[in-house]
Amino acid sequence: MNTHRYLPMTEEDKKEMLATIGVDSIEALFADIPESTRFKSQLAIEAALKEPELIAHFQKLADENQSIKTYTSFLGAGVYEHYIPSIVDHVISRSEFYTAYTPYQPEISQGELQAIFEFQTMICELTGMDIANSSMYDGPTALAEAAMLSCGHTKKKTILVSKAVHPEARAVLKTNAYGQRLNVIEIDANANVTDIESLKAAYNDEVACVIVQHPNFYGSLEPLAEIEEIVHQGKAQFVVSSNPLALGVLKPPGDFGADIVVGDAQPFGIPVQFGGPHCGYFATTKKLMRKIPGRLVGQTVDEEGRRGFVLTLQAREQHIRREKATSNICSNQALNALAASVAMTALGKQGVKEMAKQNVQKSAYLKKQLSLAGIDVVGDGPTFNEFVINCGQPVKDVNRQLLEKGMIGGFDLGSVEPERNGQMLVCVTELRTKEELDLFANEMGALV
């Protein structure tokens, strides 16, 4: 007799289910699918492997990957290799936490709710905002949600977004806006920052929000004070997308009058991995508190006066208001938010500041070394941990040669902006050593 590790349902189960919905066969269930589009052949699946054989097979496939564990990486562009305290994996792997699901029953979820509350608190401290949610799927979806909130709040349909915002974030924004029949206008960038004159020309009373990234896609710092002055001429919302690590050394967007601050918490405790998952954050003002998307954890007291934590302001959410909900996020990135919380806690306020400072200092050092090697550094404004260089040839060719030297080169800007062909976005984090930076500069000098 054959043994089966997993039987989803028996033939009797299938008959009972079909009878319940009033059809007599699987074919009848899928009758609305045209015959011409149905797959009727046998799937070309190989014979089953024994578990040791299966492990060996996937290990062989995994060994074909080129990893940052064996290569020195200078690639960022939205996903960053940072130090992760060893305690992070220990805490998030505990059975009490090992889920991304929403803790609907606060009386049995105090530990998880407190951890989420601490995440919200730390995000507020970094951004200078009044309130933050429990997490979003990633930075781009958080940015899109900020735009949707702004349009709903102002009753306007025009969104101005800087071209210095990450192109993938802009793509997610456009996808969301299309379904809502909203108008997205992109503002030109000049010298790697938002062009102020272009913003002034595009701004009018029909604008719901202005979105910038700080530090932006090119690593440059935006003139937030100038931009805020333009945005708040009318009733538009000022939305800033920020790398939270950069806020360890930068003045928080809240101090510049931002109405909404979003971003990705990946730099804290979340490793570089293909396809994610990440952890978006969303912070705003008390004025917009009841319109914020996602779960909110609040602190309260029980009937005996003891401190406790609950999901609060749930009237915004789909399990309460259904189609009238202002938030349609269900299970979120709670596990990754916990990883970010543990990382920030382990580093401490001074540790976060020191980590951010090292990013600034090491990227500045590499900029100088590349210039000495004859490489053209594009733009002379302040940057965080990324900057643009001219390679004078296809970046993919340079990166191919760098890979042979054991290095992963920077992002090919020409792949998303044809007018930037030959330009590379270089990333330097605290993990890069002086020897690695010197070697990269020397190799680039020889290649370019």
Swiss-Prot record:
Gene Ontology MF term list: glycine dehydrogenase (decarboxylating) activity
Keywords, comma-separated and alphabetical: Oxidoreductase
Pfam families in UniProt: GDC-P
Entry-linked Gene3D superfamilies: Aspartate Aminotransferase, domain 1, Type I PLP-dependent aspartate aminotransferase-like (Major domain)
Record's catalysed reaction(s): N(6)-[(R)-lipoyl]-L-lysyl-[glycine-cleavage complex H protein] + glycine + H(+) = N(6)-[(R)-S(8)-aminomethyldihydrolipoyl]-L-lysyl-[glycine-cleavage complex H protein] + CO2
Annotated PANTHER family: GLYCINE CLEAVAGE SYSTEM P-PROTEIN, GLYCINE DEHYDROGENASE (DECARBOXYLATING)
Name used for this protein in its record: Probable glycine dehydrogenase (decarboxylating) subunit 1
Organism: Shouchella clausii (strain KSM-K16) (Alkalihalobacillus clausii)
